[in-house]
């Protein structure tokens, strides 16, 4: 839990960042390349593997349970490539958003 002193420090730092007060112009120039290269080192293969893993979890949740075999059309519709937002509900129901 944050104490009052921590909250004040965070508030003053965020206010300084938003207003630009206290920042030297050369600091942004020096830190810019480092800030922009944070995600450059992540290989594209690991990103695609993470996406496929997230799509595999709902697929196993929806298609491999044997409780509601009559809802396979709904489950297959949720796993379709154009429907990106899908998740496993606690009651094993097909939940997808377009």
UniProtKB/Swiss-Prot annotation:
Pfam families: Defensin_2 (PF01097). Keywords: Antibiotic, Antimicrobial, Defensin, Disulfide bond, Immunity, Innate immunity, Signal. GO terms for biological process: defense response to bacterium; innate immune response; response to bacterium. InterPro entries: Defensin_invertebrate/fungal (IPR001542), Scorpion_toxin-like_sf (IPR036574). It comes from the Eukaryota. Belongs to the invertebrate defensin family. Type 1 subfamily. The lineage of its organism: Eukaryota, Metazoa, Ecdysozoa, Arthropoda, Hexapoda. It comes from Mamestra brassicae (Cabbage moth). Disulfide bonds join 61-88, 74-94, 78-96. Induction: By bacterial infection. This is Defensin.
